[in-house]
UniProtKB/Swiss-Prot annotation:
Function as written in the Swiss-Prot or TrEMBL entry: Clathrin is the major protein of the polyhedral coat of coated pits and vesicles. Mediates endocytosis and is required for a correct polar distribution of PIN auxin transporters.
Sample GO molecular function, one term: clathrin light chain binding
Stretches forming CHCR repeats: 551-697, 700-842, 847-986, 993-1138, 1142-1283, 1288-1434, 1437-1580
Region described as Flexible linker: 493-536
Taxon lineage: Eukaryota, Viridiplantae, Streptophyta, Embryophyta, Tracheophyta
Membrane topology, as annotated: Peripheral membrane protein
Region (WD40-like repeat 5): 206-270
Protein name per Swiss-Prot or TrEMBL: Clathrin heavy chain 1
Region called WD40-like repeat 2, residue ranges: 68-113
N-acetylalanine sites (modified residues): A2
GO terms (BP aspect): clathrin-dependent endocytosis; endocytosis; intracellular protein transport; response to water deprivation; stomatal movement; vesicle-mediated transport
WD40-like repeat 3: annotated span: 114-155
Gene: CHC1
Length: 1705
């Protein structure tokens, strides 16, 4: 059966590799397909990612970098579910993402691993763990809900599917497990069926299952079915079954009968098993898909087998339902995505014909609405009708596929049945059946509605229409209109009977719906007529209708201006305005005229409306000058100002401030330029300064930045309006920092009497010019002095203020200023009053009135400056008596006491409140000792030092410095820059320190001397303290300091100090002495304190006398001392002495250095003694290893053997390697043998020339490197037998083979190498390299064995390598064979042709050349055969026939002159109709005079130079050849040449046939004349019939009559008359039919017109509007011009549109 006729169509939708999916990822665990929408692939290389393939756009996959163990796309939407194992646990983390929203919907961490999961519904995931099954909804925040536990039969099964029934009441889980031991290849299938309602499970054997819904006849509710397929092995028999069972049968309802069927597997598929099952809900078919690609198709209702075929050569591992087409998708291992669908054109014929199952064919055709069962259905219908089974017939007609019985004939059949009394009419039964099944067609709907309307059951119609059971049509609407207009309108709308719908809406006056409906259906009604109709009754409705028209897509169907005219013709100004305002909202330039119009009509009739329009700023393209004039006339001055663009116009209008809103006028100023604005302001001030001042001030405030503040100020100043200036600057002041502005504001406020404002600004402003303001206020002499006080107080003009007030006798303001305003400035006031010679009583009273608020310091300064300090005595004493602790009070009082010499020392020592610096400074010139007292009391270091230096009071200075104990002070007085340093040091050493009893003071002084780097002075100081029996003689720190200072400053005294002092830090001082290179002193210190190690180190490291150190060590006999000596000896290279010393010291710590030194000096005997001593205390691998090495160096091999047998920690491997490296092979041999290091032992034995032992050791080592070393050594020693033993163990390693081969070859051992390789062929681990290398060796050294070797082992050779070897050695036959084996046919062919004596063999070459890829080699092969083997060239050409360019081959042979040689080849390829081949063969046939073959060639192959061939053979001596030439001319359309050539040879039949085929009347008639001239009457008669269509009857009759051949022309005439009369009859018949059609059409048009006239009253005629004033009549013509009429001159033209006349301009 051809694939085109198969009932199932298979199509490859795509291949996964074609969209970039790697073959390794096309597996069950990596690929998922949950529906026919998406395929999801999980990749793990080159990086973890998930690929989502949308089946609508498969070549645009979405790849996202995601790491997961599994990924599932939602069946319906772009939602992705991901599963990944939590690292280090057996838990799985689940996540659900919305890819489009890029948001995570839900996540959950499962406590156990999910073995399988699947989308069971678009909102639900099924999760299968090792023990249980869970459901997880993607909606809400719910966690997975456990549904049931897995049954035992699914333990250790691989879960392959999980599904739920459509009502989610039944669940099925499917798994597979290894087959039984008797049949392990057949995989077991297990199924668990679970009922959600009953909470019970049932275990069954099945490989695949699926749920379905099926309506059982007699049951309106669908039944839930499960179908499952199984294949099991029991008792040696394989059973394959398909089961279909109903789940949860409905009580009291018909149930589905259980069905089962066999699955027939072919013998080659005995171990195949079902892996998937899909149920087509569209056709109710079951698809069973097996692993090896078999497809079984069964009917769901009957379980009848329909089809079986193999749909995939590769195993199928995944399927998914393709619900839209009633098929399924399948994915196989190769990555093909296959789509299986029902072949709707062939499946019914297949079932009825091939399967002979007529009932199934009919049922499936009805169920799936499929073609192919028409005859069966019609026949069955007729049978039922004949049997009066009307109900069954009605059901069959209702279910008939593709509605073949849903015709008027069927309705007529039921109508024709007579109705029995008391029974339902069959027609109603038929319609009832149709209504239960679905929707009626238009004819059925009309017929049923007639019945219902006649019975007045309108409600039935409404119900059916609501349920969409009827197909609406215009005829149905016309029928229903007779009973219900509303219902008819609904039907018209559904039937898209647009004219009827528009008429109905117009009848209902629902004009807005007309527009909506017309837009929806694309209908264009008469909008003008509709608008006029609405205007008559509903002006506002007309506005709404016009606006709806304006919003239509594609623009308003009626011009806006026309619509406006319609409104204005009826004086509907408000409606016209409303319409225009709405449609002109876009404010487009093309609407300028309409914008002007709407403004004009409203400015004349409703100015307030026009004002609102203009205020909203809706329009910007109207005639602004025209509107400006109209606004001015209407009194809308602000609008006219906005529209005028000339300054005179603006100035004329703007003075009407009485009618202009002030705020609007202010805003208008903002639209003018600064120059025009100033001009207008001047006019306003000129007209009415007082009345317009507020507006001007407001405008200046608002636009001061644009106008310029200076310009505004000048404007007010020009009109001397200080009031305006005051109000203007008052608002601007807070924003300005201009001093001039602030000053002018102060000036304006002062001149307008705003004293409080002057006071406020002078107090708060920071920007006015203080000097200028002060002068202005002094000149103004305001009655209130507070503004002046503010200025002078803030800007430091207090003396000027005081002088002004004192001279103007404003003493009250002086007191007020000092007491209330700023008491802090009282000193300045007092100073100025003193300067103004004010009475002291007033001043004292002023001071006392302020008292504690008065700042004392500046007051004292002011009085002290003027030598009037005593003036303050009473004031100061008064403050002290009040308990004042103010330093300035006490300073002033002290100065007065010092000046009066009233016991100043008592005051200086007892008063705690004065400032020592101030008072001390005051005393310096009066009494320096008093200054020292004051400075000492205040610790004024710098001042005290300065005054004592200046007055040579060094003893006081020394005592003060010692007592202060201040480091900074000491540093200052001991610095070199101090010229009095020596005098101070002398006083400190002689007086201050000896007097001191404080250790802290001494310590501070010593530290200061050290810091100042005065060592000699410090020694002098310390000797005075330490050596002269003072209180500090035994002080530990001072003794250390004395010695250390001496070390630094005077080393000659150090030894004396060491001998005289005992209480110092010996170790520390000794180290310092060493650092100072006082080695003997250091040695003496260390000896004195018994620090022997430090002492010997001084001798060794500093004095560098090993002899003294050895002598010292013998004297003290301490191990530590000997250890130091040994180390020094070791450093100096006295290794033996050092070893002796280390032994005396019993010191093992330096064994590494001793070993190193011993090896350097080769003193291994001493080293052995030392290491034996060390071993007793230390267990170190290094020690034992070095001991063995030392034994080896002194050749004590016996001790080595004894030592390694004893317990030790030596690193024997390392020792052995070291001995081997230093060629101590015998010792190394002992070590390697002991530690069983056979590899090293082998190479050691090689060094010792012990080859047999080396081979034995190498065998034990079994290391490639060892084998190589031993092998190469044996080869060098010509021990080839042993070398071969080694070599066989080497060449099995691919990497080492070439090295062995080169080693043998470099030494000329070719035969031995070949013998080794030949032996290697038989090895179990023999690899390609051995076979290849042996082939290379044969090619080089034993050519005769090469071919045999290649043929025997061609599959085990590295052919490219051997190809190179054969090419180098020029073995062409073998090279060709190798090229063939390697599929390099181009190179093989080239080699054969280039080296044909050795390499060519015909059969082999044919096989080669048929497979070459380079096209040029074909033609090279043709040349090669032409030159060397021409006898068999056709054999070669036939092999290459499908690949050759035949034209090129012919050219090659033609140039070579051997064209005939390839005639058989050309005959074979002539079917390709190649011009060169055709011409070559025709040429050969012509030369051979083979006219039959030539004619056959011309007929069958037309690609050649026809005229050239004809010209070549038209003069041939053979007639048949000339006939061929004529035949060629005929085929080429050269009719005359062909006929002339045939005439020449008397070939009259050919002439007639040529003339007939030419279609040329003249040519045929000329031939008739020729036959008449030749007297060929029979030819004349024959020619009339042959050329019947070309010869005109009058010409034939004329020629026959003239030439007396009427008898011969008569047959022709009879035939012509018969044909002519038949044509006339046909024409008459056609004309009669056309007349009938015209009459029928006219009658139909009349019927349509009468039908339309029924609704004429609904659409009144468009009557003209009544005449309006100024218009001649109705219609749409322009109004006549009135200006030129008699008696009307001087009148302005009347306004159009019925508007009242406008005023003149």
């Amino acid at each position: 059966m051809a694939a085109a006729n198969a009932p199932i169509i298979m199509k490859e939708v795509l291949t996964l590799p074609s969209v970039g999916i790697g073959q390794q990822f096309i597996t069950f665990t990596n690929v998922t397909m949950e529906s026919d929408k998406y395929i999801c692939v999980r990749e793990t290389a080159p990086q973890n990612s998930v690929v989502i393939i949308d089946m609508n756009m498969p070549m645009q996959p979405l790849r996202r970098p995601i790491t997961a163990d599994s990924a599932l796309m939602n069946p319906n939407s772009r939602i992705l579910a991901l599963k990944a194992q939590v690292p280090g646990t057996t838990q799985d983390h689940l996540q659900i993402f919305n890819i489009e929203a890029k948001a995570k919907l839900k996540s959950h961490q499962m406590p156990e691993q999910v073995a399988f999961w699947k989308w069971i519904t678009p909102k639900m995931l099924g999760l299968v763990t090792q023990t249980s099954v869970y459901h997880w909804s993607i909606e809400g925040d719910s966690e997975p809900v456990k549904m049931f536990d897995r049954t035992a039969n699914l333990a250790n099964n691989q879960i392959i599917n999980y599904k739920c029934s459509p009502n989610e009441k039944w669940l099925v889980l499917i798994g597979i497990a290894p087959g039984s031991p008797e049949r392990p290849q057949l995989v077991k299938g297990n199924m668990q069926l679970f009922s959600v309602d009953q909470q019970r499970s049932q275990a069954l054997e099945a490989h695949a299952a699926s749920f379905a819904q099926f309506k059982v006849p007699g049951n309106e509710n669908p039944s839930i079915l499960i179908s499952f397929a199984s294949k099991s092995f029991n008792a040696g028999q394989i059973t394959s079954k398909l089961h279909v069972i109903e789940l949860g049968a409905q009580p009291g309802k018909p149930s589905f009968t259980k069905k089962q069927a066999d699955l027939f597997f072919p013998p080659d598929f005995a171990d195949d098993f079902p892996v998937a099952m899909q149920v087509s809900h569209k056709f109710n078919l079951i698809y069973v898909i097996t692993k090896l690609g078999l497809l079984f198709v069964y009917d769901l209702e009957t379980a009848s087998a329909i089809y079986r075929n193999r749909i995939s050569p590769d195993p199928i591992f995944l399927t998914s339902e393709a619900s839209s087409v009633g098929g399924f998708y399948a994915i196989n291992r190769r990555g093909q995505v296959l789509l299986a669908t029902v072949n709707e054109a062939t499946i019914i014929p297949f079932i009825s014909g091939q399967l002979n199952n007529l009932e199934l064919a009919v049922n499936l055709a009805k169920r799936g609405n499929l073609p192919g069962a028409e005859n069966l259905v019609v026949q069955r219908f007729q049978e039922l009708f004949a049997q009066t089974k009307y109900k069954e017939a009605a059901e069959l007609a209702a279910e008939s596929p593709q509605g073949i019985l849903r015709t008027p004939d069927t309705v007529a059949k039921f109508q024709s049945v007579p109705v029995q009394a008391g029974q339902t009419p069959p027609l109603l039964q038929y319609f009832g059946t149709l209504l239960t099944r679905g929707k009626l067609n238009s004819y059925e709907s009309l017929e049923l509605s007639r019945l219902v309307v006649n019975q007045n059951k309108k409600n039935l119609l409404e119900n059916w229409l609501a349920e969409d059971k009827l197909e609406c049509s215009e005829e149905l609407g016309d029928l229903v209109k007779t009973v219900d207009n509303d219902l008819a309108l609904k039907i018209y709308i559904k039937a898209r009977a647009t004219p009827k719908v528009v008429a109905a809406f117009a009848e209902r006056r629902e004009f807005d719906k007309i527009l909506i409906y017309s837009k929806q259906v694309g209908y264009t009604p008469d909008y003008m007529f509709l608008l006029q109709t609405i205007l008559r009754t509903d002006p506002q409705g007309a506005v709404n209708f016009a606006l709806m028209m304006s919003q239509m897509e594609g623009g308003c169907p009626v011009d806006y201006n026309t619509i406006t005219d319609l409104f204005l013709q009826r004086n509907l100004i408000r409606e016209a305005t409303a319409f225009l305002l709405d449609v002109l909202k876009p404010n487009l330039p093309e609407h300028a005229f309409l914008q002007t119009k709407v403004l004009e009509i409203n400015l004349v009739t409703f100015p307030n409306v026009a004002d609102a329009i203009l205020a909203n700023g809706m329009f910007s393209h109207y005639d602004r000058p025209r509107v400006a004039q109209l606004c001015e006339k209407a009194g809308l001055y602000i609008q006219s100002l906005k529209h005028y663009s000339e300054l005179p116009d603006i100035k004329r209008v703007i003075v009407n401030t009485h009618a202009i809103e002030p705020q609007a006028l202010v805003e208008f100023f903002g639209t003018l330029s600064s120059e025009w604005a100033m001009e207008c302001m001047k006019d306003l001030l000129l007209v009415n300064l007082r009345g317009n001042l507020q507006i001007i001030v407001q405008a200046c405030k608002e636009y001061c930045e644009q106008l310029g503040v200076d310009a505004c100020i000048k404007l007010f100043e020009q009109f001397k309006s200080y009031e305006g200036l005051y109000f203007f600057l008052g608002s601007y002041l807070s924003m300005s920092e201009d001093p001039e502005i602030h000053f002018k504001y102060i000036e304006a406020a002062a001149k307008t009497g705003q004293i409080k404002e002057v006071e406020r600004v002078t107090r708060e402003s920071n920007f006015y010019d203080a000097e200028k303001t002060k002068n202005f206020l002094m000149e103004a002499k305001l009655p209130d002095a507070r503004p002046l006080i503010n200025v002078c107080d803030r800007f430091g003009f207090v003396p000027d203020l005081t002088h002004y007030l004192y001279t103007n006798n404003m003493l009250r303001y002086i007191e007020g200023y000092v007491q209330k305003v700023n008491p802090g400035n009282a000193p300045l006031v007092v100073g100025q009053l003193l300067d103004d010679e004010c009475p002291e009583d007033f001043i004292k009273g002023l001071i006392l009135s302020v008292r504690s608020l008065l700042p004392v310091e500046p007051l004292v300064a002011e009085c002290e400056k003027r030598n009037r300090l005593r003036l303050l005595t009473q004031f100061l004493e008064h403050l002290v008596s009040e308990g004042s602790q103010d330093v300035h009070v006490h300073n002033a009082l002290g100065k007065i006491i010092i000046d009066s010499n009233n016991n100043p020392e008592h005051f200086l020592t007892t008063n705690p409140y004065y400032d020592s610096k101030v008072v001390g400074k005051y005393c310096e010139k009066r009494d320096p000792t008093l200054a020292v007292v004051a400075y000492r009391r205040g610790q004024c270091d710098e001042e005290l030092i300065n005054v004592t230096n200046k007055n040579s009071l060094f003893k006081l200075q020394a005592r003060y410095v010692v007592e202060r104990m201040d480091g900074d002070l000491w540093e200052k007085v001991l610095t070199e820059e101090n010229e009095y340093r020596r005098q101070l040091i002398d006083q400190v050493v002689s007086t201050a320190l000896p007097e001191s009893k404080s250790p802290e003071q001494v310590s501070a002084a010593v530290k200061a001397f050290m810091t100042a780097d005065l060592p000699h002075e410090l020694i002098e100081l310390l000797e005075k303290i330490v050596l002269q029996n003072s209180a500090f003689s035994g002080n530990f720190n001072l003794q250390n300091l004395l010695i250390l200072t001496a070390i630094k400053a005077d080393p000659s005294r150090v030894m004396d100090y060491i001998n005289r002092l005992d209480n110092f830090d010996g170790p520390a001082v000794g180290e310092v002495a060493v650092d100072a290179q006082l080695y003997e002193e250091a040695f003496a210190i260390f000896k004195k304190f018994n620090l022997n190690v430090q002492a010997v180190n001084v001798l060794l490291d500093n004095v560098r006398s090993i002899e003294r150190a050895v002598e010292f060590a013998f004297r003290v006999e301490e191990d530590a001392v000997w250890s130091q000596v040994a180390k020094a000896q070791l450093r100096e290279g006295l290794v033996s002495d050092a070893i002796e010393s280390f032994i005396r010291a019993d010191d093992t710590t330096q064994f590494l250095e001793v070993i190193r030194a011993s090896e350097d000096t080769n003193v291994y005997d001493d080293l052995v003694r030392y290491l034996l001593m060390v071993r007793q205390k230390v267990k170190e691998p290094k020690v034992d290893s070095e001991l063995i090495y030392a034994y080896a160096k002194i050749e004590r091999l016996g001790e080595i053997e004894e030592f390694i047998l004893m317990p030790n920690v030596a690193n024997l491997q390392h020792v052995g390697d070291r001995l081997y490296d230093e060629a101590l092979y015998e010792a190394a041999k002992i070590i390697y043998a002991f530690i069983s290091n056979w590899a090293k032992l082998a190479v050691t034995l090689v060094k010792l020339q012990q080859f047999q032992g080396a081979v034995d050791a190498a065998r034990k080592a079994n290391s490639a490197k060892t084998w190589k070393e031993v092998c190469f050594a044996c080869v060098d020693a010509e021990e080839f037998r042993l070398a071969q033993i080694c070599g066989l163990n080497i060449i099995i390693q691919v990497d080492d083979l070439e090295e062995v081969s080169e080693y043998y070859q470099n030494r000329g051992c070719f035969n031995e190498l070949i013998s080794l390789m030949e032996s290697g062929l038989g090895l179990e681990r023999a690899h390609m390299g051995i076979f290849t290398e042996l082939g290379v060796l044969y090619a080089r050294y034993r050519y005769e064995k090469l071919m045999e070797h290649i043929k025997l082992f061609s599959t085990r050779l590295n052919i490219p390598k051997l190809i190179r070897a054969c090419d180098e050695q020029q073995h062409w036959q073998e090279l060709t064979y190798l090229y063939i084996q390697y599929d390099e046919f181009d190179n093989a062919a080239t080699t054969v042709m280039n080296h044909s004596p050795e390499a060519w063999e015909h059969m082999q070459f044919k096989d080669i050349v048929a497979k070459v890829a380079n096209v040029e080699l074909y033609y090279k092969a043709v040349h090669f055969y032409l030159q060397e083997h021409p006898d068999i060239i056709n054999d070669l050409l036939n092999v290459l026939a499908l690949r050759l360019d035949h034209t090129r081959v012919v050219d090659i042979m033609r140039k070579a002159g051997h064209l005939r040689l390839i005639k058989p080849y050309m005959v074979a390829v002539q079917s390709n109709n190649v011009s060169a081949v055709n011409e070559a063969l025709n040429e050969i046939y012509a030369e051979e005079e083979d006219y039959d073959r030539l004619r056959e060639s011309i007929d069958l192959h037309d690609s050649f130079d026809q005229i050239g061939l004809a010209q070549k053979i038209e003069k041939h001596e053979l007639v048949e050849m000339r006939r061929v030439a004529a035949y060629i001319y005929k085929k080429a359309g050269r009719w005359k040449q062909s006929i002339a050539l045939s005439k020449k040879d008397n070939m009259y039949k050919d002439c007639m046939e040529t003339a007939s085929q030419s279609g040329d009347h003249d040519l045929a008639e000329q031939l008739l004349v020729y036959f008449i001239e030749q007297g060929k009457k029979e030819c004349f008669a024959t020619c009339l019939f042959v050329c019947y269509d070309l010869i005109r009857p009058d010409v034939a009759l004329e020629l026959a009559w003239i030439n007396n051949m009427i008898d011969f022309a008569f047959p022709y005439l009879l035939q012509f008359i018969r044909e002519y009369s038949g044509k006339v009859d046909e024409l008459i018949k056609d004309k009669l039919e056309a007349q009938k059609e015209v009459k029928a059409k006219e009658q139909e048009e009349k019927d349509v017109m009468s039908q339309q006239n029924m609704y004429a009253q609904l659409l009144p005629l468009a009557l003209p509007a009544p005449p309006m004033p100024g218009m001649g009549g109705g219609g749409y013509g322009p109004p006549p011009q009135m200006g030129g009429m008699p008696g009307m001159s001087g009148m302005p033209p009347m306004p159009p549109y019925g508007m009242p006349p406008m005023g003149g301009y």
